[in-house]
Design a protein with these regions (language model features):
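Active-site beta-loop-alpha junctions of metal-dependent nucleic acid enzymes
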Residues: 116-138
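An active-site-proximal beta-strand-loop segment
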Residues: 74, 78-113, 119-123
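Short small-residue beta-strand/loop micro-motif enriched in glycine and branched aliphatics
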Residues: 111-115, 169-172, 195-198
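Mobile genetic element proteins and their domesticated derivatives, centered on retroelements
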Residues: 7, 23, 39, 43, ...
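C-terminal domain-tail junction helix/linker
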Residues: 163-167, 191-242
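Basic, flexible linker segments flanking DNA-binding modules
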Residues: 1-80, 176, 232-241
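Conserved, non-catalytic sequence blocks in retroelement Pol enzymes and Pol-derived host proteins
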Residues: 13-16, 31-32, 76-78, 94-95, ...
Length: 242
């Protein structure tokens, strides 16, 4: 297979989600010696263009419970998995209605620890997400769990559930998206790669739910990232805990 064919193969396999940088790294991982500018030129000649970022669900409803201190304070640095997590809710709009995605992201590995997709942004959704995420690990004591000041995270159930595990709660300042930029970046990437321009492809909640499950599995186990030394999140976690 020549280089142009291999570039097209990588681009097609990842459904147009990879741009120049990731395709270049994938070729390097496949033992190719090639300059990223050459990859860029070939992609341009082939008319291959990686998807690029756009919106957001706002869950802030004022002070309805207890607001935690901003312990993260934009310090997203970590030395190993299970030191810092973040969460948020994002909205997806379709001709047939809306869906809401609530994931937990590990700040060290960028792995989606757990997630819940729902047609309603309610406390039951948060409960399901927490049960799946918190139930995966024997000990989470000392972990800092960050979020915005959404009503869900001020709720007594949420605060008590993480406190019981020894988790320390942290919240962004009101209306400051940069305080949770890791999650903002994740949502932008996800929507760009499997939602924007494809809204009409998902004809029902069930179809979108299946596509989301497929994407999260792909994201965790196959999608390489610069932050994780060009490994998928799960592989990077395993390498970090050896």
């Amino acid at each position: 297979m020549n280089l142009a064919s291999e570039i097209k193969d990588v681009f097609t396999y990842h459904k147009g989600r990879y741009g120049v940088r990731r395709i270049h790294r994938e070729l390097v991982n496949r033992s190719h010696t090639v300059n990223h500018k050459r990859v860029q030129r070939i992609m341009h000649e082939l008319g291959l263009c990686g998807k690029r970022p756009k919106e957001k669900y706002h869950s802030y409803q004022g002070v309805v419970g207890k607001v935690a201190d901003n312990l993260i304070n934009r310090d997203f640095t970590t030395t190993k998995p299970l030191q810092k997590w973040t969460t948020d809710v994002s909205q997806f709009s379709f001709p047939w209605g809306k869906c809401y995605l609530s994931p937990i992201l590990d700040m060290h590995t960028n792995e989606v620890i757990s997630y819940d997709l729902s047609q309603s942004p309610n406390m039951e959704q948060i409960r399901r997400m927490l049960e799946k995420g918190l139930g995966r690990f024997a000990s989470l004591k000392g972990l800092i769990f960050h979020s915005d000041q959404g009503w869900q995270y001020q709720h007594a159930y949420y605060r008590n559930a993480i406190k019981e595990k020894g988790i320390i709660q942290s919240m962004s300042r009101k209306g400051n998206c940069y305080d949770n930029s890791i999650m903002e970046t994740f949502f932008g990437r996800l929507k760009n790669e499997m939602f924007y321009g494809r809204e009409k492809d998902y004809r029902s909640y069930e179809e979108f739910s299946a596509a989301m499950a497929e994407y999260i599995d792909y994201y965790n186990n196959e999608r390489i990232q610069a932050k994780t030394k060009w490994m998928p999140p799960v592989k990077y976690r395993m390498a970090s805990t050896c």
